[in-house]
């Protein structure tokens, strides 16, 4: 516990423009990795296959998988099918038509991390799932609108929560949010 608190107080919360550019380069590799995976996601494959593709792609582009070995995590990606919230471990279970896969990817490149997630559909999915995906996508844009001078991260979260609740959905309150940088 004390080590974690010590780490938090030693983190630089405000980044220089040079640091932001290095984080951007890592994040761009994350985006390219997720984009590459999009064409590979289909019924009949397993998530371990996607994980292996991602690791090779990241390394081929001079990055290091950001999650692999972090807190003993055994894989490159966190892949959470259907209603699993986060941090799913890739395995040999076969992906089926109608599922959704939340894929979280992190990359370390040039000493800085990039990290984001995207939810993919596997073939045709139920109308209710498509509605959920559209509402969560719109809530992202509602949150982005709150990133302005004088606002705090809590203002962003508040806007997202209010939007989702106005549409009959809630928000996950655990395992959400972290900084980016060298750690």
Regions found by a protein language model. Give the residues of each.
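Active-site neighborhoods and metal-handling regions in enzymes and metal-associated proteins
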Residues: 2-183
